[in-house]
Regions:
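Glycine-rich, proline-tolerant flexible connector loops at the mouths of alpha/beta enzymes
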Residues: 75-91
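Active-site acidic/histidine proton-transfer and metal-coordination neighborhood
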Residues: 12-17, 37-39, 79, 108-210, ...
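Anion (oxyanion) recognition and catalysis
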Residues: 66, 91, 130, 169, ...
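Mid-chain, structured segments of secreted extracytoplasmic proteins
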Residues: 90-117
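Catalytic domains of carbohydrate-active enzymes, especially glycoside hydrolases
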Residues: 61-79
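Active-site-proximal loop/turn and secondary-structure-junction residues that shape catalytic pockets
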Residues: 51-53, 79, 103-106, 143-145, ...
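Histidine-acidic metal/acid-base catalytic patches
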Residues: 2-46, 51, 55-67, 133-135, ...
Length: 296
């Protein structure tokens, strides 16, 4: 008897429902859900506690991160926060402050007139880092300056970082320069994509001035995440992630994070990966995206 392809395909769904043994059907095994989904075997994730559990008091967010298995946290500006309480809480829980923001968007590092203030703030931020036992702080380049070309602004970023590099080297706190994206989140920012950030950090030439390699921003700005990581890995100081579109947790968008994290691991990165994303669902469920991203 001859069976047509159309008949075979039409019969297949019914056979799958009625004829397949029960043992071959997918099941929801409660035991397969990890109790601490952020305690992943290969990647060390740091919860961004500005974006996760935002409605809770700050110390409670750290506690929640610990309960999900995060070994570390990160946050934005340190000013206005109780650093002594944060240091005490993370120490009690055996957690690390992976990084925080030491210099933000304004005033811009891309203008020479701001460099004295920048150096002073890096000095103060290093003291904050020491209090938190933290070894990295993010530095932002700044928004576009009227009358300056992008090349001129980048030259000023280099000049400012060269002034601050001796402080970072003396204190053992790495300055991590973060390129943004200008298509979705930061229109008018002067530094986007990894290639420009790599050029800047190579020009500075300090082992304590590297890149905060935000995979979400770089995906939007330039794509080819694995290729760019390979080309600029010598300047990578820290990694952050989120999926796109939506800036939510891995598994909700178009970035295949298992492959990207595998590439990072193959290149030799063993530092923390900051989870700077908005959970699309309750945090305990969103953290499952991290668990799955770590499976390769």
């Amino acid at each position: 008897m001859t069976i047509s392809r159309r008949a075979l395909l039409a019969a297949a769904p019914a056979a799958a429902l009625t004829g397949a043994p029960a043992s071959s059907r997918p099941t929801q095994d409660p035991a397969a859900r990890p109790a601490k989904p952020a305690a992943t075997p290969k990647t060390r994730f740091a919860a961004n506690v500005e974006m996760w559990w935002g409605g809770l008091p700050f110390l409670d967010r750290i506690q929640k991160a610990h309960e999900l298995g995060f070994p570390a946290i990160e946050f934005w500006p340190w000013r206005g926060k109780d650093l002594a309480a944060i240091a005490k809480k993370t120490k009690e829980l055996g957690m690390t402050v992976a990084q925080f923001t030491g210099w933000g968007f304004s005033p811009g590092l891309n203008e020479a007139k701001n460099h004295v203030a920048f150096v002073a703030e890096i000095e103060a931020s290093c003291k904050a880092a020491k209090q938190l036992d933290c070894t990295r702080m993010t530095v932002v380049g700044g928004n576009d300056v009227q009358g300056m070309t992008q090349a001129q602004m980048h030259e000023q970023i280099i000049a400012g970082l060269k002034l601050a590099a001796p402080i970072a080297e003396r204190e053992g706190v790495m300055l991590i320069l973060e390129p943004m994206n200008i298509r979705v989140d930061h229109k008018g920012h002067c530094l986007y994509g990894s290639e420009a950030a790599v050029r800047i950090c190579r020009a500075v030439g300090s082992p304590m001035v590297k890149i905060n390699w935000d995979l979400y921003h770089c995906h939007i700005s330039e794509g080819d995440l694995c290729g760019h990581l390979h080309d600029g890995f010598d300047q990578l100081g820290y990694v952050q992630l989120a999926d796109h579109p939506g800036r939510t947790e891995p598994g909700t968008g178009e970035i295949h994070y298992p492959r990207v994290l595998q590439e990072l691991h193959a290149l030799g990165y063993r530092g923390f990966v900051g989870v700077e994303c908005n959970p699309s669902k309750p945090e305990a469920d969103a953290a499952l995206g991290l668990w799955h991203a770590d499976q390769w």
